[in-house]
Protein backbone atom coordinates (compact mmCIF):
# COMPACT_ATOMS: atom_id res chain seq x y z
CA UNK A 1 0.00 0.00 0.00
CA UNK A 2 1.30 3.49 -0.74
CA UNK A 3 2.40 5.30 2.41
CA UNK A 4 0.06 8.30 2.01
CA UNK A 5 -3.00 6.03 2.00
CA UNK A 6 -1.64 3.93 4.87
CA UNK A 7 -0.88 6.95 7.04
CA UNK A 8 -4.16 8.67 6.22
CA UNK A 9 -5.96 5.48 7.30
CA UNK A 10 -3.92 5.38 10.51
CA UNK A 11 -4.88 8.99 11.22
CA UNK A 12 -8.54 7.95 10.90
CA UNK A 13 -7.97 5.11 13.40
CA UNK A 14 -6.27 7.59 15.76
CA UNK A 15 -9.34 9.84 15.66
CA UNK A 16 -11.63 6.87 16.29
CA UNK A 17 -9.53 5.76 19.28
CA UNK A 18 -9.55 9.24 20.84
CA UNK A 19 -13.34 9.54 20.41
CA UNK A 20 -13.87 6.15 22.04
CA UNK A 21 -11.66 7.10 24.99
CA UNK A 22 -12.75 10.76 25.30
CA UNK A 23 -16.14 11.22 23.57
CA UNK A 24 -16.17 14.95 24.41
CA UNK A 25 -13.07 15.63 22.27
CA UNK A 26 -13.90 17.43 19.04
CA UNK A 27 -12.26 16.49 15.75
CA UNK A 28 -10.14 18.85 13.67
CA UNK A 29 -8.25 17.54 10.64
CA UNK A 30 -5.95 14.54 10.19
CA UNK A 31 -3.86 14.40 7.01
CA UNK A 32 -0.88 12.30 6.07
CA UNK A 33 2.34 14.32 5.97
CA UNK A 34 5.95 13.65 5.07
CA UNK A 35 7.15 10.76 7.25
CA UNK A 36 3.83 10.33 9.06
CA UNK A 37 0.47 11.82 9.96
CA UNK A 38 -1.26 13.91 12.59
CA UNK A 39 -4.73 14.62 13.93
CA UNK A 40 -5.94 17.79 15.67
CA UNK A 41 -8.35 17.65 18.58
CA UNK A 42 -10.16 20.27 20.63
CA UNK A 43 -9.76 19.09 24.21
CA UNK A 44 -9.37 21.06 27.41
CA UNK A 45 -6.47 18.96 28.66
CA UNK A 46 -3.24 18.17 26.84
CA UNK A 47 -2.63 14.49 26.14
CA UNK A 48 -0.01 13.00 28.49
CA UNK A 49 2.49 10.24 27.72
CA UNK A 50 0.16 7.87 29.58
CA UNK A 51 -2.72 9.04 27.36
CA UNK A 52 -0.67 8.31 24.23
CA UNK A 53 -0.04 4.78 25.49
CA UNK A 54 -3.80 4.31 26.04
CA UNK A 55 -4.56 5.66 22.57
CA UNK A 56 -2.01 3.32 20.97
CA UNK A 57 -3.58 0.37 22.79
CA UNK A 58 -7.07 1.36 21.65
CA UNK A 59 -5.82 1.84 18.06
CA UNK A 60 -4.32 -1.66 18.12
CA UNK A 61 -7.68 -3.05 19.27
CA UNK A 62 -9.42 -1.35 16.32
CA UNK A 63 -6.75 -2.69 13.94
CA UNK A 64 -7.04 -6.22 15.35
CA UNK A 65 -10.80 -6.15 14.69
CA UNK A 66 -10.04 -5.55 10.99
CA UNK A 67 -12.91 -3.07 10.66
CA UNK A 68 -13.79 -2.07 7.10
CA UNK A 69 -13.44 1.50 5.86
CA UNK A 70 -16.78 2.28 4.22
CA UNK A 71 -17.15 5.34 2.00
CA UNK A 72 -20.47 7.17 1.68
CA UNK A 73 -21.43 10.17 -0.47
CA UNK A 74 -23.68 12.86 1.01
CA UNK A 75 -24.96 16.12 -0.35
CA UNK A 76 -23.67 19.20 1.46
CA UNK A 77 -26.85 19.83 3.47
CA UNK A 78 -27.04 16.21 4.61
CA UNK A 79 -23.43 16.40 5.77
CA UNK A 80 -24.08 19.63 7.68
CA UNK A 81 -27.09 18.11 9.41
CA UNK A 82 -25.09 15.00 10.32
CA UNK A 83 -22.11 16.83 11.83
CA UNK A 84 -24.36 19.33 13.59
CA UNK A 85 -26.07 16.39 15.28
CA UNK A 86 -22.64 15.00 16.24
CA UNK A 87 -21.66 18.45 17.60
CA UNK A 88 -18.48 18.40 15.52
CA UNK A 89 -17.99 22.17 15.22
CA UNK A 90 -14.75 22.03 13.22
CA UNK A 91 -16.22 19.66 10.65
CA UNK A 92 -19.07 22.15 10.21
CA UNK A 93 -16.51 24.90 9.64
CA UNK A 94 -14.84 22.77 6.98
CA UNK A 95 -18.20 22.16 5.30
CA UNK A 96 -18.80 25.92 5.17
CA UNK A 97 -15.61 26.24 3.11
CA UNK A 98 -16.59 23.52 0.61
CA UNK A 99 -18.11 24.62 -2.69
CA UNK A 100 -18.89 21.16 -4.13
CA UNK A 101 -22.43 19.77 -3.89
CA UNK A 102 -21.29 16.33 -2.74
CA UNK A 103 -18.90 15.33 0.04
CA UNK A 104 -17.67 11.97 1.27
CA UNK A 105 -17.48 10.44 4.72
CA UNK A 106 -15.73 7.28 5.87
CA UNK A 107 -17.18 4.93 8.49
CA UNK A 108 -15.59 2.14 10.51
CA UNK A 109 -17.66 -0.50 12.32
CA UNK A 110 -20.74 1.76 12.20
CA UNK A 111 -19.36 3.44 15.34
CA UNK A 112 -17.18 6.15 13.95
CA UNK A 113 -17.36 8.40 10.93
CA UNK A 114 -15.27 11.26 9.62
CA UNK A 115 -15.50 13.85 6.88
CA UNK A 116 -12.83 12.73 4.45
CA UNK A 117 -11.96 12.65 0.76
CA UNK A 118 -9.93 9.47 1.19
CA UNK A 119 -8.54 7.25 -0.07
CA UNK A 120 -8.23 4.72 2.74
CA UNK A 121 -7.15 1.12 3.14
CA UNK A 122 -9.92 -1.43 2.63
CA UNK A 123 -9.85 -2.28 6.35
CA UNK A 124 -8.03 -1.35 9.55
CA UNK A 125 -6.26 -4.73 9.59
CA UNK A 126 -4.07 -3.57 6.73
CA UNK A 127 -2.24 -1.26 9.14
CA UNK A 128 0.71 -3.41 10.22
CA UNK A 129 3.11 -1.03 11.94
CA UNK A 130 2.45 2.35 13.56
CA UNK A 131 3.69 4.54 16.39
CA UNK A 132 2.43 7.73 18.05
CA UNK A 133 5.34 10.14 18.41
CA UNK A 134 4.50 13.41 20.11
CA UNK A 135 1.93 16.00 21.14
CA UNK A 136 1.98 19.68 20.20
CA UNK A 137 -0.29 22.71 20.07
CA UNK A 138 -1.63 23.96 16.73
CA UNK A 139 -3.98 26.80 15.87
CA UNK A 140 -7.00 25.90 13.77
CA UNK A 141 -6.05 26.62 10.15
CA UNK A 142 -2.68 27.89 11.44
CA UNK A 143 -4.12 31.29 12.42
CA UNK A 144 -3.20 32.70 15.83
CA UNK A 145 -6.64 34.30 16.14
CA UNK A 146 -8.24 30.83 16.01
CA UNK A 147 -8.57 28.33 18.89
CA UNK A 148 -5.51 26.35 19.92
CA UNK A 149 -6.00 22.63 19.29
CA UNK A 150 -4.00 19.63 20.50
CA UNK A 151 -2.12 17.84 17.72
CA UNK A 152 -1.00 14.21 17.98
CA UNK A 153 1.77 13.19 15.58
CA UNK A 154 2.39 9.61 14.50
CA UNK A 155 3.88 7.51 11.75
CA UNK A 156 3.09 4.24 9.99
CA UNK A 157 4.89 1.84 7.66
CA UNK A 158 4.02 -1.30 5.77
CA UNK A 159 6.34 -3.46 7.89
CA UNK A 160 7.58 -3.49 11.48
CA UNK A 161 11.17 -3.54 10.18
CA UNK A 162 10.64 -0.28 8.27
CA UNK A 163 9.03 1.31 11.34
CA UNK A 164 11.91 0.18 13.56
CA UNK A 165 14.46 1.66 11.15
CA UNK A 166 12.52 4.94 10.97
CA UNK A 167 12.30 5.23 14.77
CA UNK A 168 16.04 4.61 14.94
CA UNK A 169 16.55 7.48 12.46
CA UNK A 170 14.29 9.74 14.55
CA UNK A 171 16.36 8.99 17.67
CA UNK A 172 19.53 9.84 15.74
CA UNK A 173 17.90 13.05 14.48
CA UNK A 174 17.15 14.05 18.09
CA UNK A 175 20.80 13.48 18.98
CA UNK A 176 21.86 15.72 16.09
CA UNK A 177 19.21 18.42 16.60
CA UNK A 178 20.90 21.80 16.01
CA UNK A 179 18.49 23.45 18.47
CA UNK A 180 20.14 21.41 21.22
CA UNK A 181 23.70 21.10 19.88
CA UNK A 182 24.05 24.74 18.78
CA UNK A 183 23.69 26.26 22.28
CA UNK A 184 25.58 23.33 23.88
CA UNK A 185 28.57 23.91 21.60
CA UNK A 186 28.47 27.66 22.16
CA UNK A 187 27.45 28.51 18.58
CA UNK A 188 24.23 30.45 18.98
CA UNK A 189 21.15 31.12 21.04
CA UNK A 190 17.73 32.68 20.55
CA UNK A 191 16.57 34.83 23.47
CA UNK A 192 12.82 34.53 22.99
CA UNK A 193 11.75 36.50 26.05
CA UNK A 194 14.50 39.11 26.19
CA UNK A 195 14.95 39.93 22.49
CA UNK A 196 12.24 38.14 20.53
CA UNK A 197 11.51 34.85 18.81
CA UNK A 198 13.28 33.97 15.57
CA UNK A 199 16.24 36.32 16.12
CA UNK A 200 19.64 34.61 16.24
CA UNK A 201 22.50 35.65 18.53
CA UNK A 202 25.84 34.15 17.44
CA UNK A 203 28.23 33.42 20.30
CA UNK A 204 32.01 33.63 19.68
CA UNK A 205 32.35 30.10 18.25
CA UNK A 206 29.26 30.49 16.08
CA UNK A 207 30.53 33.84 14.81
CA UNK A 208 33.82 32.19 13.78
CA UNK A 209 31.94 29.41 11.96
CA UNK A 210 29.78 31.92 10.15
CA UNK A 211 32.78 34.07 9.20
CA UNK A 212 34.56 31.01 7.74
CA UNK A 213 31.52 30.33 5.55
CA UNK A 214 31.29 34.00 4.57
CA UNK A 215 35.00 34.12 3.69
CA UNK A 216 34.56 31.10 1.42
CA UNK A 217 31.53 32.73 -0.20
CA UNK A 218 33.29 36.05 -0.87
CA UNK A 219 36.43 34.42 -2.28
CA UNK A 220 34.47 32.10 -4.59
CA UNK A 221 32.09 34.80 -5.83
CA UNK A 222 34.91 37.19 -6.69
CA UNK A 223 36.73 34.36 -8.47
CA UNK A 224 33.62 33.79 -10.61
CA UNK A 225 33.20 37.37 -11.76
CA UNK A 226 30.66 38.64 -9.23
CA UNK A 227 30.83 42.20 -7.90
CA UNK A 228 30.11 42.75 -4.22
CA UNK A 229 27.50 45.31 -3.23
CA UNK A 230 25.99 46.36 0.10
CA UNK A 231 22.60 47.94 0.64
CA UNK A 232 20.84 49.47 3.69
CA UNK A 233 18.66 47.36 5.94
CA UNK A 234 15.82 49.90 5.73
CA UNK A 235 14.33 51.80 2.81
CA UNK A 236 11.23 53.83 2.03
CA UNK A 237 7.92 52.09 1.64
CA UNK A 238 7.65 53.57 -1.86
CA UNK A 239 10.42 51.26 -3.07
CA UNK A 240 8.43 48.23 -1.95
CA UNK A 241 5.26 49.56 -3.53
CA UNK A 242 7.11 49.89 -6.83
CA UNK A 243 8.62 46.40 -6.54
CA UNK A 244 5.22 44.87 -5.82
CA UNK A 245 6.27 43.38 -2.49
CA UNK A 246 3.95 45.76 -0.67
CA UNK A 247 0.93 44.26 -2.44
CA UNK A 248 1.96 40.61 -2.31
CA UNK A 249 4.11 40.37 0.81
CA UNK A 250 2.95 43.07 3.21
CA UNK A 251 1.85 40.72 5.99
CA UNK A 252 5.43 39.39 6.22
CA UNK A 253 7.10 42.82 6.25
CA UNK A 254 8.20 44.96 9.20
CA UNK A 255 6.80 48.42 8.45
CA UNK A 256 7.30 51.53 10.59
CA UNK A 257 7.23 55.32 10.38
CA UNK A 258 10.05 57.87 10.70
CA UNK A 259 9.19 61.59 10.50
CA UNK A 260 5.75 60.71 9.10
CA UNK A 261 7.26 58.68 6.27
CA UNK A 262 6.83 54.94 5.96
CA UNK A 263 9.92 52.73 5.96
CA UNK A 264 10.39 48.98 5.61
CA UNK A 265 12.95 46.62 7.12
CA UNK A 266 14.01 44.86 3.93
CA UNK A 267 12.49 41.40 3.40
CA UNK A 268 14.54 40.91 0.21
CA UNK A 269 17.65 42.34 -1.44
CA UNK A 270 16.52 42.50 -5.08
CA UNK A 271 15.07 46.06 -5.17
CA UNK A 272 18.32 47.43 -3.71
CA UNK A 273 20.44 45.62 -6.28
CA UNK A 274 18.15 46.92 -9.03
CA UNK A 275 18.71 50.52 -7.88
CA UNK A 276 22.46 49.97 -8.22
CA UNK A 277 21.96 48.53 -11.73
CA UNK A 278 19.88 51.59 -12.64
CA UNK A 279 22.48 54.03 -11.34
CA UNK A 280 23.99 54.39 -14.81
CA UNK A 281 23.34 53.47 -18.43
CA UNK A 282 24.29 49.88 -19.18
CA UNK A 283 25.54 48.56 -22.52
CA UNK A 284 25.32 45.03 -23.89
CA UNK A 285 29.12 45.08 -23.58
CA UNK A 286 28.73 45.40 -19.78
CA UNK A 287 26.56 42.29 -19.49
CA UNK A 288 26.37 39.95 -17.74
CA UNK A 289 26.42 42.00 -14.53
CA UNK A 290 26.49 39.88 -11.38
CA UNK A 291 25.79 41.69 -8.09
CA UNK A 292 26.43 39.67 -4.93
CA UNK A 293 25.75 40.42 -1.28
CA UNK A 294 25.69 38.57 2.01
CA UNK A 295 22.39 40.30 2.60
CA UNK A 296 20.49 40.21 5.87
CA UNK A 297 16.72 40.28 5.49
CA UNK A 298 13.82 40.35 7.94
CA UNK A 299 10.53 38.55 7.45
CA UNK A 300 7.68 38.23 9.89
CA UNK A 301 6.91 34.56 10.47
CA UNK A 302 4.17 33.38 12.80
CA UNK A 303 5.58 32.13 16.08
CA UNK A 304 4.09 28.68 15.48
CA UNK A 305 6.27 28.04 12.41
CA UNK A 306 9.59 29.29 13.84
CA UNK A 307 12.08 26.44 14.20
CA UNK A 308 15.65 26.93 15.45
CA UNK A 309 17.86 28.23 12.62
CA UNK A 310 15.66 26.73 9.91
CA UNK A 311 12.79 29.21 10.18
CA UNK A 312 13.71 32.57 11.68
CA UNK A 313 12.68 36.22 11.38
CA UNK A 314 16.10 37.64 10.55
CA UNK A 315 18.59 35.80 8.36
CA UNK A 316 21.45 36.35 5.93
CA UNK A 317 21.57 34.81 2.48
CA UNK A 318 24.23 34.65 -0.21
CA UNK A 319 22.05 36.63 -2.55
CA UNK A 320 23.03 37.50 -6.11
CA UNK A 321 21.20 39.05 -9.04
CA UNK A 322 22.43 38.50 -12.57
CA UNK A 323 21.43 40.85 -15.39
CA UNK A 324 22.10 39.33 -18.81
CA UNK A 325 21.02 39.08 -22.44
CA UNK A 326 18.83 36.20 -23.71
CA UNK A 327 21.89 34.73 -25.42
CA UNK A 328 23.81 34.67 -22.13
CA UNK A 329 21.03 33.10 -20.05
CA UNK A 330 21.89 29.40 -20.39
CA UNK A 331 25.59 30.04 -19.81
CA UNK A 332 24.83 31.92 -16.59
CA UNK A 333 22.53 29.13 -15.36
CA UNK A 334 25.21 26.53 -16.13
CA UNK A 335 27.83 28.55 -14.23
CA UNK A 336 25.54 28.78 -11.19
CA UNK A 337 24.94 25.01 -11.28
CA UNK A 338 28.71 24.43 -11.36
CA UNK A 339 29.11 26.77 -8.38
CA UNK A 340 26.39 25.00 -6.37
CA UNK A 341 27.75 21.50 -6.99
CA UNK A 342 31.30 22.53 -6.07
CA UNK A 343 30.12 24.32 -2.90
CA UNK A 344 28.11 21.28 -1.79
CA UNK A 345 31.17 19.06 -2.12
CA UNK A 346 33.40 21.54 -0.28
CA UNK A 347 31.05 21.42 2.71
CA UNK A 348 30.69 17.63 2.58
CA UNK A 349 27.32 17.13 0.88
CA UNK A 350 27.54 14.62 -1.97
CA UNK A 351 23.84 14.04 -2.62
CA UNK A 352 21.13 16.47 -3.60
CA UNK A 353 17.70 16.62 -5.23
CA UNK A 354 16.91 19.03 -8.05
CA UNK A 355 13.44 20.31 -8.94
CA UNK A 356 12.39 22.39 -11.95
CA UNK A 357 9.18 24.38 -11.42
CA UNK A 358 7.41 25.57 -14.56
CA UNK A 359 4.79 28.10 -15.68
CA UNK A 360 1.69 28.34 -13.45
CA UNK A 361 -1.81 29.12 -14.71
CA UNK A 362 -1.52 32.76 -13.67
CA UNK A 363 1.71 34.36 -14.81
CA UNK A 364 3.11 37.63 -16.06
CA UNK A 365 5.29 38.22 -19.11
CA UNK A 366 5.20 36.79 -22.59
CA UNK A 367 4.64 33.10 -23.28
CA UNK A 368 7.73 33.12 -25.51
CA UNK A 369 9.88 34.49 -22.65
CA UNK A 370 8.65 31.72 -20.33
CA UNK A 371 9.38 29.06 -22.92
CA UNK A 372 12.86 30.42 -23.57
CA UNK A 373 13.71 30.66 -19.85
CA UNK A 374 12.32 27.20 -19.04
CA UNK A 375 14.22 25.71 -21.97
CA UNK A 376 17.44 27.38 -20.79
CA UNK A 377 16.99 25.96 -17.27
CA UNK A 378 16.23 22.50 -18.64
CA UNK A 379 19.07 22.45 -21.16
CA UNK A 380 21.57 23.57 -18.52
CA UNK A 381 20.50 20.68 -16.26
CA UNK A 382 20.70 18.17 -19.11
CA UNK A 383 24.09 19.37 -20.30
CA UNK A 384 25.46 18.93 -16.77
CA UNK A 385 24.02 15.40 -16.71
CA UNK A 386 21.94 16.21 -13.63
CA UNK A 387 18.75 14.27 -12.91
CA UNK A 388 15.79 16.42 -11.88
CA UNK A 389 12.10 16.32 -11.13
CA UNK A 390 9.66 18.62 -12.95
CA UNK A 391 6.95 20.34 -10.91
CA UNK A 392 4.45 21.41 -13.61
CA UNK A 393 2.77 24.74 -12.84
CA UNK A 394 4.70 25.21 -9.58
CA UNK A 395 6.86 28.13 -10.72
CA UNK A 396 6.39 31.60 -9.25
CA UNK A 397 4.01 33.87 -11.18
CA UNK A 398 7.03 35.91 -12.32
CA UNK A 399 9.25 33.11 -13.68
CA UNK A 400 10.36 29.44 -13.72
CA UNK A 401 12.99 28.23 -11.26
CA UNK A 402 15.37 25.47 -10.20
CA UNK A 403 15.52 24.42 -6.53
CA UNK A 404 18.39 22.31 -5.23
CA UNK A 405 17.91 20.48 -1.93
CA UNK A 406 20.89 18.85 -0.25
CA UNK A 407 20.71 15.46 1.47
CA UNK A 408 22.31 15.14 4.88
CA UNK A 409 23.79 12.11 6.64
CA UNK A 410 20.28 10.92 7.55
CA UNK A 411 19.06 11.35 3.93
CA UNK A 412 16.87 14.31 4.91
CA UNK A 413 16.39 17.13 2.42
CA UNK A 414 17.37 20.74 3.19
CA UNK A 415 16.46 23.64 0.90
CA UNK A 416 19.66 25.15 -0.40
CA UNK A 417 20.24 26.74 -3.81
CA UNK A 418 17.66 28.46 -6.01
CA UNK A 419 17.97 29.80 -9.56
CA UNK A 420 14.92 31.95 -10.34
CA UNK A 421 14.08 33.77 -13.57
CA UNK A 422 12.17 37.02 -13.03
CA UNK A 423 10.02 38.73 -15.67
CA UNK A 424 8.28 41.04 -13.18
CA UNK A 425 10.93 43.27 -11.61
CA UNK A 426 12.69 44.28 -14.86
CA UNK A 427 9.30 45.52 -16.10
CA UNK A 428 8.31 47.21 -12.84
CA UNK A 429 11.61 49.13 -12.71
CA UNK A 430 11.79 49.62 -16.48
CA UNK A 431 15.29 48.11 -16.62
CA UNK A 432 17.23 48.38 -19.84
CA UNK A 433 20.58 48.13 -21.56
CA UNK A 434 21.71 49.51 -24.92
CA UNK A 435 21.95 46.66 -27.41
CA UNK A 436 24.31 46.31 -30.39
CA UNK A 437 21.89 48.34 -32.54
CA UNK A 438 21.80 51.23 -30.08
CA UNK A 439 18.27 50.41 -28.88
CA UNK A 440 17.07 50.13 -25.29
CA UNK A 441 16.42 46.47 -24.50
CA UNK A 442 15.05 44.74 -21.40
CA UNK A 443 17.64 42.54 -19.64
CA UNK A 444 16.84 39.11 -18.25
CA UNK A 445 17.14 38.99 -14.47
CA UNK A 446 18.14 35.93 -12.44
CA UNK A 447 17.81 35.70 -8.66
CA UNK A 448 20.08 33.03 -7.22
CA UNK A 449 21.44 31.76 -3.92
CA UNK A 450 24.11 29.08 -3.51
CA UNK A 451 23.93 28.03 0.15
CA UNK A 452 20.73 29.99 0.73
CA UNK A 453 20.06 31.21 4.25
CA UNK A 454 23.34 31.00 6.21
CA UNK A 455 21.32 30.31 9.35
CA UNK A 456 19.58 27.33 7.77
CA UNK A 457 22.85 26.11 6.23
CA UNK A 458 24.62 26.26 9.61
CA UNK A 459 21.73 24.26 11.09
CA UNK A 460 22.17 21.70 8.30
CA UNK A 461 25.94 21.53 8.90
CA UNK A 462 25.50 20.95 12.64
CA UNK A 463 23.00 18.13 12.06
CA UNK A 464 24.89 16.57 9.12
CA UNK A 465 28.08 16.30 11.19
CA UNK A 466 26.33 15.83 14.57
CA UNK A 467 28.28 18.89 15.74
CA UNK A 468 31.71 17.41 14.88
CA UNK A 469 32.52 19.79 12.03
CA UNK A 470 35.41 19.10 9.64
CA UNK A 471 38.72 20.56 10.77
CA UNK A 472 38.67 23.55 8.40
CA UNK A 473 35.28 24.65 9.76
CA UNK A 474 35.86 23.90 13.45
CA UNK A 475 35.79 27.17 15.47
CA UNK A 476 38.49 25.70 17.73
CA UNK A 477 40.75 23.28 15.85
CA UNK A 478 43.20 22.35 18.60
CA UNK A 479 43.15 22.52 22.38
CA UNK A 480 46.36 22.16 24.40
CA UNK A 481 46.37 20.78 27.96
CA UNK A 482 49.43 20.88 30.23
CA UNK A 483 49.29 18.05 32.78
CA UNK A 484 50.55 20.41 35.51
CA UNK A 485 51.24 24.13 35.85
CA UNK A 486 54.99 23.53 35.44
CA UNK A 487 54.36 22.53 31.80
CA UNK A 488 52.20 25.55 31.01
CA UNK A 489 55.08 27.53 29.47
CA UNK A 490 55.75 24.69 27.01
CA UNK A 491 52.03 24.54 26.18
CA UNK A 492 52.06 28.30 25.52
CA UNK A 493 55.12 27.90 23.29
CA UNK A 494 53.25 25.33 21.15
CA UNK A 495 50.13 27.49 21.13
CA UNK A 496 52.08 30.51 19.90
CA UNK A 497 53.67 28.48 17.11
CA UNK A 498 50.31 27.09 15.93
CA UNK A 499 48.70 30.54 16.30
CA UNK A 500 51.38 32.01 14.02
CA UNK A 501 50.45 29.47 11.33
CA UNK A 502 46.82 30.60 11.41
CA UNK A 503 45.33 27.67 13.32
CA UNK A 504 42.57 28.28 15.87
CA UNK A 505 43.97 27.18 19.23
CA UNK A 506 42.75 27.15 22.83
CA UNK A 507 44.77 26.51 25.98
CA UNK A 508 43.14 24.68 28.90
CA UNK A 509 45.36 24.92 31.98
CA UNK A 510 42.58 24.77 34.55
CA UNK A 511 43.13 22.91 37.81
CA UNK A 512 40.56 20.25 36.83
CA UNK A 513 41.80 16.67 36.36
CA UNK A 514 43.19 15.85 32.93
CA UNK A 515 40.44 13.30 32.27
CA UNK A 516 37.76 15.86 33.07
CA UNK A 517 39.36 18.42 30.74
CA UNK A 518 39.66 15.85 27.94
CA UNK A 519 36.02 14.85 28.42
CA UNK A 520 35.01 18.52 28.21
CA UNK A 521 36.94 18.96 24.95
CA UNK A 522 35.27 15.84 23.54
CA UNK A 523 31.86 17.30 24.38
CA UNK A 524 32.87 20.54 22.64
CA UNK A 525 33.76 18.48 19.52
CA UNK A 526 37.26 20.01 19.32
CA UNK A 527 39.08 17.97 16.64
CA UNK A 528 42.57 17.75 18.20
CA UNK A 529 43.48 17.47 21.88
CA UNK A 530 47.18 17.91 22.72
CA UNK A 531 48.54 16.85 26.11
CA UNK A 532 51.98 17.96 27.31
CA UNK A 533 53.91 16.74 30.35
CA UNK A 534 57.49 16.00 31.36
CA UNK A 535 58.16 13.50 28.55
CA UNK A 536 56.79 15.85 25.89
CA UNK A 537 58.83 18.74 27.30
CA UNK A 538 62.02 16.66 27.30
CA UNK A 539 61.46 15.34 23.74
CA UNK A 540 59.91 18.56 22.37
CA UNK A 541 56.86 16.54 21.26
CA UNK A 542 53.11 16.51 21.92
CA UNK A 543 50.75 13.68 22.86
CA UNK A 544 47.92 13.79 20.32
CA UNK A 545 44.33 12.66 20.67
CA UNK A 546 41.75 12.98 17.86
CA UNK A 547 38.22 13.75 19.05
CA UNK A 548 36.06 10.65 18.95
CA UNK A 549 39.11 8.40 18.43
CA UNK A 550 41.77 6.81 20.58
CA UNK A 551 45.13 8.37 21.43
CA UNK A 552 47.26 8.89 18.30
CA UNK A 553 50.44 8.78 20.34
CA UNK A 554 53.41 11.10 20.46
CA UNK A 555 54.32 13.40 17.54
CA UNK A 556 56.88 16.05 16.89
CA UNK A 557 55.49 19.53 16.38
CA UNK A 558 56.45 19.30 12.69
CA UNK A 559 54.54 16.02 12.26
CA UNK A 560 51.48 17.52 13.94
CA UNK A 561 51.59 20.66 11.79
CA UNK A 562 51.91 18.59 8.61
CA UNK A 563 48.96 16.39 9.64
CA UNK A 564 46.72 19.37 10.41
CA UNK A 565 47.66 21.20 7.20
CA UNK A 566 46.92 18.12 5.09
CA UNK A 567 43.56 17.56 6.79
CA UNK A 568 42.55 21.20 6.28
CA UNK A 569 43.42 20.94 2.57
CA UNK A 570 41.25 17.83 2.20
Regions found by a protein language model. Give the residues of each.
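NTP/phosphate- and nucleic-acid-binding module
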Residues: 1-26, 32-570
Amino acid sequence: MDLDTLRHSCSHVLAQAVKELWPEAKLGIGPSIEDGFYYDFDRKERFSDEDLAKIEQKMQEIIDKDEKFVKEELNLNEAKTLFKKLKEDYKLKLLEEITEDQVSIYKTADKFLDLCRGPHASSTGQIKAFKLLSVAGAYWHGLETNPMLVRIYGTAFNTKEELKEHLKTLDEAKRRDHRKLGPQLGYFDIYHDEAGAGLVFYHPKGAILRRLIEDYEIKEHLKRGYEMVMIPHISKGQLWIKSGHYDYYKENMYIFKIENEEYVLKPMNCPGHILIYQSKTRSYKDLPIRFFELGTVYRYEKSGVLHGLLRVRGFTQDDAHIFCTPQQLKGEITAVLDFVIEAMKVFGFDEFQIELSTQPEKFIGEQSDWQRATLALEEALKEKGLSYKVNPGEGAFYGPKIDIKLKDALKRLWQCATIQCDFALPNRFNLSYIDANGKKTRPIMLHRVILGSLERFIGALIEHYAGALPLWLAPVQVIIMPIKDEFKDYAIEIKNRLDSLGFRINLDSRSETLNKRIHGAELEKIPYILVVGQRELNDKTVSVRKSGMQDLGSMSQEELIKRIEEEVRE
